[in-house]
Curated annotation (Swiss-Prot):
PANTHER family: F-BOX/KELCH-REPEAT PROTEIN SKIP25 (PTHR47590), F-BOX_KELCH-REPEAT PROTEIN SKIP25 (PTHR47590:SF1). Gene3D superfamilies: Kelch-type beta propeller. This is F-box/kelch-repeat protein SKIP25. GO terms for cellular component: nucleus. InterPro entries: F-box-like_dom_sf, Kelch-typ_b-propeller. Pfam families: Kelch_FKB95. The keyword Repeat applies. Keywords: Kelch repeat, Nucleus, Repeat, Ubl conjugation pathway. The lineage of its organism: Eukaryota, Viridiplantae, Streptophyta, Embryophyta, Tracheophyta. Part of a SCF (ASK-cullin-F-box) protein ligase complex. Interacts with SKP1A/ASK1.
Amino acid sequence: MEKKLKRRESMSTTAAESPPAKRRRTVTGNENSALIEGLPDHISEICLSLVHRPSLLSAVCTRWRRLLYSPEFPSFPSLYALFVDSTSDTGRVNPSVRFMCFNPVSSKWYPLPPPPPDPPLHRILYRHPSFISFNLPIQCVSAAGKLILIAGSNQQLSPAISHPLIFDPISSSWSSGPRIGSPRRWCATGACDGAIYIASGISSQFSSTVAKSVEKLDLTEQNRNNHRFNWEKLRDMRDLRFSREAIDAVGYRRKLLMVNVKGDAVKEGAIYDVVKDDWEPMPEEMLVGWRGPVAAMEEEILYSVDERRGTVRKYDDEKREWREVVVVEGGEEMLKGATQVTADSGKLCVVTGDGKIVVVDVAAEPAKIWNVEIPDGLEPVSVHVLPRMSQPNFC
Protein backbone atom coordinates (compact mmCIF):
# COMPACT_ATOMS: atom_id res chain seq x y z
CA MET A 1 0.00 0.00 0.00
CA GLU A 2 2.86 2.39 0.84
CA LYS A 3 4.48 1.69 -2.52
CA LYS A 4 1.16 2.34 -4.25
CA LEU A 5 0.77 5.67 -2.51
CA LYS A 6 4.35 6.67 -3.32
CA ARG A 7 3.81 5.87 -6.98
CA ARG A 8 0.65 7.95 -7.07
CA GLU A 9 2.46 10.83 -5.37
CA SER A 10 5.27 10.54 -7.91
CA MET A 11 2.79 10.72 -10.78
CA SER A 12 1.14 13.78 -9.23
CA THR A 13 4.50 15.49 -8.82
CA THR A 14 5.45 14.79 -12.43
CA ALA A 15 2.16 16.24 -13.66
CA ALA A 16 2.61 19.34 -11.53
CA GLU A 17 6.06 20.00 -12.98
CA SER A 18 4.97 19.56 -16.63
CA PRO A 19 4.35 22.58 -18.91
CA PRO A 20 0.73 23.79 -18.68
CA ALA A 21 -0.18 22.99 -22.28
CA LYS A 22 1.18 19.46 -22.09
CA ARG A 23 -0.51 18.84 -18.75
CA ARG A 24 -3.90 19.95 -20.08
CA ARG A 25 -3.57 17.65 -23.07
CA THR A 26 -2.64 14.66 -20.88
CA VAL A 27 -5.34 15.16 -18.27
CA THR A 28 -8.11 16.02 -20.72
CA GLY A 29 -7.42 13.07 -23.02
CA ASN A 30 -9.17 14.31 -26.19
CA GLU A 31 -11.38 11.52 -27.49
CA ASN A 32 -10.05 12.07 -31.04
CA SER A 33 -6.38 12.03 -30.03
CA ALA A 34 -4.19 8.95 -30.24
CA LEU A 35 -3.95 6.71 -27.19
CA ILE A 36 -0.17 7.02 -27.47
CA GLU A 37 1.16 9.78 -29.69
CA GLY A 38 2.80 8.42 -32.85
CA LEU A 39 1.28 4.92 -32.60
CA PRO A 40 -1.89 3.43 -34.14
CA ASP A 41 -4.53 2.74 -31.49
CA HIS A 42 -4.45 -1.03 -31.94
CA ILE A 43 -0.70 -1.05 -31.23
CA SER A 44 -1.22 1.33 -28.29
CA GLU A 45 -3.84 -1.02 -26.82
CA ILE A 46 -1.35 -3.90 -26.91
CA CYS A 47 1.27 -1.76 -25.17
CA LEU A 48 -1.14 -0.55 -22.48
CA SER A 49 -2.44 -4.07 -21.86
CA LEU A 50 1.06 -4.99 -20.63
CA VAL A 51 0.66 -2.60 -17.67
CA HIS A 52 -0.56 -4.83 -14.84
CA ARG A 53 -1.72 -2.01 -12.57
CA PRO A 54 -4.99 -0.56 -13.91
CA SER A 55 -4.87 2.26 -11.35
CA LEU A 56 -1.79 3.67 -13.11
CA LEU A 57 -3.57 3.79 -16.48
CA SER A 58 -6.68 5.28 -14.91
CA ALA A 59 -4.69 8.15 -13.40
CA VAL A 60 -3.24 9.37 -16.72
CA CYS A 61 -6.22 10.58 -18.76
CA THR A 62 -9.92 10.07 -19.43
CA ARG A 63 -9.39 8.14 -22.65
CA TRP A 64 -7.09 5.62 -21.00
CA ARG A 65 -9.59 5.29 -18.18
CA ARG A 66 -12.40 4.59 -20.65
CA LEU A 67 -10.21 2.07 -22.44
CA LEU A 68 -9.91 0.10 -19.19
CA TYR A 69 -13.65 -0.61 -19.26
CA SER A 70 -14.08 -1.23 -22.98
CA PRO A 71 -14.86 -4.77 -24.21
CA GLU A 72 -11.71 -4.72 -26.36
CA PHE A 73 -9.35 -4.27 -23.40
CA PRO A 74 -8.32 -7.21 -21.16
CA SER A 75 -10.41 -7.32 -18.00
CA PHE A 76 -8.86 -6.74 -14.59
CA PRO A 77 -10.14 -8.65 -11.54
CA SER A 78 -12.84 -7.07 -9.40
CA LEU A 79 -14.53 -8.10 -6.17
CA TYR A 80 -18.19 -9.12 -6.30
CA ALA A 81 -20.23 -9.54 -3.14
CA LEU A 82 -23.62 -10.81 -2.07
CA PHE A 83 -24.95 -8.45 0.60
CA VAL A 84 -27.98 -8.36 2.85
CA ASP A 85 -29.34 -5.28 4.58
CA SER A 86 -27.92 -5.24 8.09
CA THR A 87 -30.47 -4.94 10.89
CA SER A 88 -30.51 -5.18 14.67
CA ASP A 89 -34.20 -6.10 14.68
CA THR A 90 -34.75 -8.65 17.43
CA GLY A 91 -37.69 -10.05 15.48
CA ARG A 92 -35.24 -11.36 12.90
CA VAL A 93 -36.99 -9.64 10.01
CA ASN A 94 -35.73 -11.03 6.69
CA PRO A 95 -33.40 -8.48 5.04
CA SER A 96 -33.18 -7.60 1.36
CA VAL A 97 -30.61 -9.37 -0.80
CA ARG A 98 -28.43 -7.46 -3.26
CA PHE A 99 -25.32 -7.91 -5.38
CA MET A 100 -22.56 -5.33 -5.77
CA CYS A 101 -19.14 -5.01 -7.41
CA PHE A 102 -16.09 -3.31 -5.90
CA ASN A 103 -13.94 -1.53 -8.47
CA PRO A 104 -10.29 -1.62 -7.30
CA VAL A 105 -9.35 1.35 -9.52
CA SER A 106 -11.94 3.79 -8.20
CA SER A 107 -12.27 2.04 -4.78
CA LYS A 108 -16.06 2.29 -5.09
CA TRP A 109 -18.93 -0.18 -4.89
CA TYR A 110 -21.40 -0.38 -7.78
CA PRO A 111 -24.74 -2.24 -7.81
CA LEU A 112 -25.19 -5.01 -10.32
CA PRO A 113 -28.14 -4.72 -12.73
CA PRO A 114 -31.38 -6.21 -11.38
CA PRO A 115 -31.59 -9.98 -11.93
CA PRO A 116 -34.59 -11.65 -13.63
CA PRO A 117 -37.81 -11.53 -11.58
CA ASP A 118 -37.92 -15.32 -11.19
CA PRO A 119 -37.08 -16.09 -8.46
CA PRO A 120 -37.65 -12.74 -6.71
CA LEU A 121 -34.64 -12.04 -4.51
CA HIS A 122 -36.83 -10.77 -1.68
CA ARG A 123 -38.30 -14.27 -1.32
CA ILE A 124 -34.91 -15.78 -0.50
CA LEU A 125 -34.64 -16.09 3.27
CA TYR A 126 -31.57 -15.10 5.25
CA ARG A 127 -33.20 -14.75 8.67
CA HIS A 128 -36.20 -16.52 10.12
CA PRO A 129 -37.80 -16.30 13.60
CA SER A 130 -37.54 -20.09 13.96
CA PHE A 131 -33.75 -19.95 13.60
CA ILE A 132 -32.55 -17.40 16.14
CA SER A 133 -28.98 -18.64 16.54
CA PHE A 134 -27.94 -18.69 12.88
CA ASN A 135 -28.70 -17.31 9.43
CA LEU A 136 -30.04 -19.38 6.57
CA PRO A 137 -27.47 -20.00 3.82
CA ILE A 138 -27.62 -18.28 0.43
CA GLN A 139 -25.23 -20.12 -1.87
CA CYS A 140 -23.32 -18.53 -4.75
CA VAL A 141 -20.42 -19.84 -6.81
CA SER A 142 -18.24 -18.41 -9.56
CA ALA A 143 -17.14 -20.33 -12.65
CA ALA A 144 -16.08 -19.58 -16.23
CA GLY A 145 -15.91 -15.88 -15.37
CA LYS A 146 -19.53 -15.76 -14.20
CA LEU A 147 -21.36 -15.39 -10.87
CA ILE A 148 -24.08 -17.93 -10.14
CA LEU A 149 -26.79 -17.84 -7.47
CA ILE A 150 -27.59 -21.49 -7.02
CA ALA A 151 -29.33 -22.32 -3.72
CA GLY A 152 -31.35 -20.81 -0.88
CA SER A 153 -34.56 -21.19 1.14
CA ASN A 154 -37.95 -19.53 0.64
CA GLN A 155 -40.65 -18.55 3.13
CA GLN A 156 -41.89 -22.15 3.31
CA LEU A 157 -38.32 -23.35 4.03
CA SER A 158 -38.27 -25.08 0.65
CA PRO A 159 -35.70 -24.58 -2.13
CA ALA A 160 -36.01 -21.01 -3.40
CA ILE A 161 -34.12 -21.53 -6.64
CA SER A 162 -35.15 -23.96 -9.36
CA HIS A 163 -33.07 -22.31 -12.11
CA PRO A 164 -29.64 -20.83 -11.32
CA LEU A 165 -29.28 -17.10 -11.87
CA ILE A 166 -26.14 -16.40 -13.91
CA PHE A 167 -24.44 -13.00 -14.10
CA ASP A 168 -21.97 -12.28 -16.91
CA PRO A 169 -19.71 -9.30 -16.03
CA ILE A 170 -18.57 -8.77 -19.63
CA SER A 171 -22.12 -8.13 -20.86
CA SER A 172 -23.29 -6.83 -17.46
CA SER A 173 -26.40 -8.98 -17.74
CA TRP A 174 -28.24 -11.78 -15.94
CA SER A 175 -29.74 -14.92 -17.41
CA SER A 176 -31.60 -17.94 -16.07
CA GLY A 177 -29.87 -21.27 -16.42
CA PRO A 178 -31.60 -24.60 -17.11
CA ARG A 179 -33.77 -26.11 -14.43
CA ILE A 180 -31.94 -28.02 -11.72
CA GLY A 181 -32.95 -31.69 -11.76
CA SER A 182 -33.58 -31.70 -8.01
CA PRO A 183 -33.74 -28.14 -6.58
CA ARG A 184 -32.30 -28.13 -3.08
CA ARG A 185 -31.01 -26.09 -0.15
CA TRP A 186 -28.39 -26.66 2.58
CA CYS A 187 -26.27 -28.45 0.00
CA ALA A 188 -22.69 -28.60 -1.25
CA THR A 189 -21.96 -26.18 -4.10
CA GLY A 190 -18.74 -25.55 -5.97
CA ALA A 191 -16.97 -25.18 -9.30
CA CYS A 192 -14.17 -26.92 -11.17
CA ASP A 193 -12.85 -26.47 -14.73
CA GLY A 194 -15.64 -24.08 -15.75
CA ALA A 195 -18.49 -26.26 -14.48
CA ILE A 196 -20.65 -25.83 -11.38
CA TYR A 197 -21.70 -28.68 -9.11
CA ILE A 198 -24.51 -29.12 -6.63
CA ALA A 199 -24.54 -32.12 -4.28
CA SER A 200 -26.52 -33.55 -1.39
CA GLY A 201 -28.77 -31.17 0.55
CA ILE A 202 -32.49 -31.12 1.24
CA SER A 203 -35.43 -30.55 -1.10
CA SER A 204 -38.86 -29.54 0.23
CA GLN A 205 -38.55 -32.48 2.61
CA PHE A 206 -35.64 -34.74 3.40
CA SER A 207 -35.07 -37.35 0.73
CA SER A 208 -32.27 -39.90 0.77
CA THR A 209 -32.27 -39.79 -3.03
CA VAL A 210 -31.59 -36.04 -3.09
CA ALA A 211 -29.16 -36.26 -0.16
CA LYS A 212 -26.90 -38.57 -2.18
CA SER A 213 -27.39 -37.06 -5.63
CA VAL A 214 -24.94 -34.86 -7.55
CA GLU A 215 -25.56 -32.64 -10.59
CA LYS A 216 -23.25 -30.71 -12.90
CA LEU A 217 -23.75 -27.77 -15.28
CA ASP A 218 -20.93 -26.95 -17.72
CA LEU A 219 -20.70 -23.16 -18.19
CA THR A 220 -17.86 -23.08 -20.71
CA GLU A 221 -18.74 -21.23 -23.92
CA GLN A 222 -18.42 -24.33 -26.07
CA ASN A 223 -21.05 -26.15 -24.02
CA ARG A 224 -23.38 -23.14 -23.62
CA ASN A 225 -23.54 -22.66 -27.40
CA ASN A 226 -24.81 -26.15 -28.14
CA HIS A 227 -28.15 -27.78 -27.42
CA ARG A 228 -26.86 -29.81 -24.47
CA PHE A 229 -26.76 -26.94 -21.99
CA ASN A 230 -28.49 -28.86 -19.22
CA TRP A 231 -27.75 -30.32 -15.82
CA GLU A 232 -26.02 -33.69 -15.92
CA LYS A 233 -26.59 -36.28 -13.23
CA LEU A 234 -23.38 -37.74 -11.81
CA ARG A 235 -22.45 -40.70 -9.64
CA ASP A 236 -24.20 -40.62 -6.25
CA MET A 237 -22.35 -39.88 -3.04
CA ARG A 238 -21.62 -42.87 -0.84
CA ASP A 239 -23.63 -41.74 2.20
CA LEU A 240 -26.05 -39.10 3.52
CA ARG A 241 -23.67 -37.26 5.84
CA PHE A 242 -23.27 -34.19 3.64
CA SER A 243 -26.84 -32.92 3.96
CA ARG A 244 -26.46 -31.39 7.44
CA GLU A 245 -25.59 -27.83 6.35
CA ALA A 246 -24.51 -25.69 3.41
CA ILE A 247 -20.88 -26.37 2.54
CA ASP A 248 -18.36 -25.39 -0.12
CA ALA A 249 -17.14 -27.92 -2.67
CA VAL A 250 -13.63 -26.63 -3.36
CA GLY A 251 -12.31 -27.15 -6.89
CA TYR A 252 -8.72 -28.40 -6.65
CA ARG A 253 -6.66 -30.08 -9.37
CA ARG A 254 -9.68 -31.46 -11.23
CA LYS A 255 -11.28 -32.69 -8.04
CA LEU A 256 -13.93 -31.36 -5.66
CA LEU A 257 -13.10 -31.37 -1.95
CA MET A 258 -15.97 -31.45 0.56
CA VAL A 259 -16.11 -31.54 4.35
CA ASN A 260 -19.51 -32.20 5.87
CA VAL A 261 -19.60 -29.83 8.87
CA LYS A 262 -18.05 -26.54 9.94
CA GLY A 263 -16.44 -25.52 13.21
CA ASP A 264 -14.67 -27.87 15.62
CA ALA A 265 -17.12 -30.77 15.31
CA VAL A 266 -15.98 -34.20 14.18
CA LYS A 267 -15.76 -34.05 10.39
CA GLU A 268 -15.85 -36.34 7.42
CA GLY A 269 -14.29 -35.41 4.09
CA ALA A 270 -14.97 -36.66 0.59
CA ILE A 271 -13.25 -36.08 -2.75
CA TYR A 272 -15.01 -36.24 -6.11
CA ASP A 273 -12.85 -36.86 -9.18
CA VAL A 274 -14.46 -34.83 -12.00
CA VAL A 275 -12.58 -36.83 -14.66
CA LYS A 276 -13.33 -40.34 -13.39
CA ASP A 277 -16.80 -39.50 -12.00
CA ASP A 278 -15.92 -41.32 -8.81
CA TRP A 279 -15.67 -40.70 -5.06
CA GLU A 280 -12.89 -41.33 -2.55
CA PRO A 281 -12.42 -40.48 1.14
CA MET A 282 -10.39 -37.41 2.03
CA PRO A 283 -6.98 -38.22 3.56
CA GLU A 284 -6.78 -37.43 7.26
CA GLU A 285 -3.76 -35.15 6.76
CA MET A 286 -5.83 -32.98 4.42
CA LEU A 287 -9.00 -33.11 6.53
CA VAL A 288 -7.19 -31.87 9.64
CA GLY A 289 -6.66 -28.45 8.03
CA TRP A 290 -10.40 -27.79 7.62
CA ARG A 291 -10.74 -25.49 10.64
CA GLY A 292 -12.61 -22.79 8.76
CA PRO A 293 -13.32 -21.76 5.18
CA VAL A 294 -11.02 -23.15 2.46
CA ALA A 295 -10.32 -21.97 -1.10
CA ALA A 296 -7.97 -22.96 -3.91
CA MET A 297 -5.86 -20.37 -5.72
CA GLU A 298 -6.37 -20.96 -9.48
CA GLU A 299 -7.64 -24.42 -8.42
CA GLU A 300 -4.00 -25.36 -7.71
CA ILE A 301 -3.02 -24.22 -4.18
CA LEU A 302 -5.20 -24.78 -1.11
CA TYR A 303 -5.51 -22.14 1.61
CA SER A 304 -7.51 -22.32 4.83
CA VAL A 305 -8.44 -19.67 7.39
CA ASP A 306 -8.87 -20.89 10.96
CA GLU A 307 -12.18 -19.39 12.08
CA ARG A 308 -11.23 -19.54 15.77
CA ARG A 309 -7.57 -18.47 15.71
CA GLY A 310 -7.47 -16.43 12.50
CA THR A 311 -4.38 -18.22 11.20
CA VAL A 312 -3.84 -18.81 7.47
CA ARG A 313 -2.51 -22.16 6.26
CA LYS A 314 -1.31 -23.44 2.91
CA TYR A 315 -1.46 -27.11 1.91
CA ASP A 316 1.74 -28.76 0.72
CA ASP A 317 0.53 -31.52 -1.58
CA GLU A 318 3.93 -33.22 -1.85
CA LYS A 319 4.51 -33.44 1.89
CA ARG A 320 0.77 -33.83 2.59
CA GLU A 321 0.75 -31.27 5.36
CA TRP A 322 -0.62 -27.82 6.16
CA ARG A 323 1.92 -25.05 6.76
CA GLU A 324 1.13 -21.79 8.49
CA VAL A 325 1.45 -18.59 6.44
CA VAL A 326 3.17 -15.78 8.32
CA VAL A 327 1.04 -12.63 8.32
CA VAL A 328 1.73 -9.09 9.51
CA GLU A 329 1.38 -8.37 13.22
CA GLY A 330 -2.26 -8.27 14.28
CA GLY A 331 -3.43 -10.01 11.10
CA GLU A 332 -4.81 -13.09 12.83
CA GLU A 333 -7.08 -10.91 14.96
CA MET A 334 -8.63 -9.42 11.81
CA LEU A 335 -9.37 -12.89 10.43
CA LYS A 336 -11.01 -14.45 13.48
CA GLY A 337 -14.55 -15.57 12.80
CA ALA A 338 -13.91 -16.16 9.09
CA THR A 339 -17.01 -17.57 7.40
CA GLN A 340 -16.13 -17.61 3.69
CA VAL A 341 -13.03 -17.18 1.54
CA THR A 342 -12.18 -16.93 -2.14
CA ALA A 343 -8.70 -16.97 -3.69
CA ASP A 344 -7.45 -15.23 -6.81
CA SER A 345 -4.41 -13.36 -8.16
CA GLY A 346 -2.27 -14.09 -5.11
CA LYS A 347 -4.84 -12.80 -2.63
CA LEU A 348 -7.45 -14.24 -0.29
CA CYS A 349 -10.70 -12.33 0.17
CA VAL A 350 -12.33 -13.28 3.47
CA VAL A 351 -15.78 -12.59 4.92
CA THR A 352 -15.75 -12.48 8.72
CA GLY A 353 -18.52 -13.06 11.23
CA ASP A 354 -18.53 -9.42 12.32
CA GLY A 355 -19.53 -8.25 8.84
CA LYS A 356 -16.18 -7.30 7.32
CA ILE A 357 -14.34 -8.12 4.10
CA VAL A 358 -10.62 -8.68 4.64
CA VAL A 359 -7.97 -9.10 1.93
CA VAL A 360 -4.82 -11.17 2.56
CA ASP A 361 -1.93 -10.74 0.12
CA VAL A 362 -0.34 -14.18 0.48
CA ALA A 363 2.23 -13.36 -2.23
CA ALA A 364 3.91 -10.93 0.20
CA GLU A 365 6.20 -12.03 3.03
CA PRO A 366 4.85 -11.60 5.61
CA ALA A 367 1.34 -11.63 4.14
CA LYS A 368 -0.24 -8.18 4.15
CA ILE A 369 -3.80 -7.73 5.39
CA TRP A 370 -6.30 -4.90 4.99
CA ASN A 371 -10.04 -4.26 5.20
CA VAL A 372 -12.23 -3.36 2.23
CA GLU A 373 -14.67 -0.65 3.23
CA ILE A 374 -18.21 -1.86 2.64
CA PRO A 375 -21.33 0.24 1.95
CA ASP A 376 -23.19 1.53 4.99
CA GLY A 377 -26.10 -0.59 6.13
CA LEU A 378 -24.98 -3.75 4.33
CA GLU A 379 -23.66 -7.07 5.63
CA PRO A 380 -21.54 -9.31 3.35
CA VAL A 381 -22.58 -12.94 2.91
CA SER A 382 -20.05 -14.08 0.31
CA VAL A 383 -17.40 -12.63 -2.00
CA HIS A 384 -16.12 -13.69 -5.42
CA VAL A 385 -13.43 -12.46 -7.82
CA LEU A 386 -14.46 -12.01 -11.46
CA PRO A 387 -13.58 -9.78 -14.43
CA ARG A 388 -14.64 -6.14 -14.15
CA MET A 389 -17.97 -5.07 -15.59
CA SER A 390 -18.01 -3.32 -18.97
CA GLN A 391 -19.94 -0.24 -17.92
CA PRO A 392 -19.19 3.38 -18.85
CA ASN A 393 -20.50 4.70 -15.53
CA PHE A 394 -17.38 3.24 -13.88
CA CYS A 395 -15.39 6.01 -15.52
